[in-house]
């Protein structure tokens, strides 16, 4: 693959992951997967939540794509774009974790934005959490 194709694949995957996250949150986490997601909407002092298992699902998706793209794993059957799709999923997971768990829920650091887009993002998420039930 050319460098431009690699970059476009990583960026396209990153962007596509926003749709995957939105739709899985709406239809899975607040649907049949509510059992894992419920504790994310309830106050607690635990370091981890069942909801964190969804992060592991994302990690498995990324690792699987890395494996599909790896000649070390699949030999001549490796599909090179898999590596770059896996990287796009990985980058999305890192950004999502830093923004959602770090900035919004302050699990890793304490910083409350006073203005701008970051403040609006935190406010919108708090409004989402104000909803009781699924």
Where are these regions (language model features)?
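Membrane-embedded catalytic scaffold of the fatty acid hydroxylase/desaturase
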Residues: 17-134
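Short, strongly hydrophobic alpha-helical membrane anchors
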Residues: 1-4
């Amino acid at each position: 693959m050319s460098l431009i194709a690699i970059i476009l694949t990583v960026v396209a995957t990153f962007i596509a992951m926003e749709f995957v996250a939105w739709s899985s949150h709406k239809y899975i986490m607040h649907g049949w997967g509510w059992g894992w997601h419920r504790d994310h909407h309830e106050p607690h002092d635990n370091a981890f939540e069942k909801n964190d298992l969804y992060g592991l699902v994302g990690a498995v998706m990324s690792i699987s794509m890395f494996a599909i793209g790896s000649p070390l794993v699949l030999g001549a059957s490796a599909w090179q774009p898999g590596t770059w799709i896996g990287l796009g999923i990985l980058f999305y997971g890192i950004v999502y974790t830093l923004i959602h768990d770090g900035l919004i829920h302050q699990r890793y650091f304490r910083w409350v934005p006073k203005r701008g887009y970051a403040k609006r993002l935190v406010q919108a998420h708090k409004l989402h959490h104000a909803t009781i039930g699924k």
